Amino acid sequence: MIRRPPAVVCYICGREYGTKSISIHEPQCLKKWHNENNLLPKELRRPVPKKPEVRTITAKGFYDLDALNEAAWTSAHSQLVPCNVCGRTFLPDRLIVHQRSCKPKAAK
């Protein structure tokens, strides 16, 4: 059985990155998030995502990777906004695109 290298979930976008590259990715992802958030209409703008705090579990200062990833995934998904027509959730910039084609269900 082949073991995958440990991956860390980005708390901003929810994607997985290697333990070495996450520290490079997060500042770039946050900058992109700010740029995209500033382009949204005021009513769709979101508060800045906060990096989840997970306590170290060993004397050497290691983190519980599963707990860290769970907290990051929850943080990333808390930014989703529901469509006021169908209720599906989207990132705010994708909600605008979705709403162009979302139609209320016809009454039976």
From Swiss-Prot:
What UniProt keywords are attached to this protein's entry? Metal-binding, Repeat, Zinc, Zinc-finger
Origin species, per record, is Homo sapiens (Human)
What protein name does the entry list?
Answer: Zinc finger protein 475
Positions with a binding annotation for Zn(2+) 2: C83, C86, H98, C102
* The organism's taxonomic lineage, starting at the top: Eukaryota, Metazoa, Chordata, Craniata, Vertebrata
Molecular function via GO: zinc ion binding
Q: Which domain of life is it from?
A: Eukaryota
Residues reported in the UniProt entry to bind Zn(2+) 1: C10, C13, H25, C29
- Cofactor(s) needed by this chain: Zn(2+)
User: Which residues belong to zinc fingers classed as C2HC/C3H-type?
Assistant: 6-35, 79-108
- Which InterPro entries does its entry note? ZC2HC1A/B-like (IPR026319), Znf_C2HC_C3H (IPR049899)
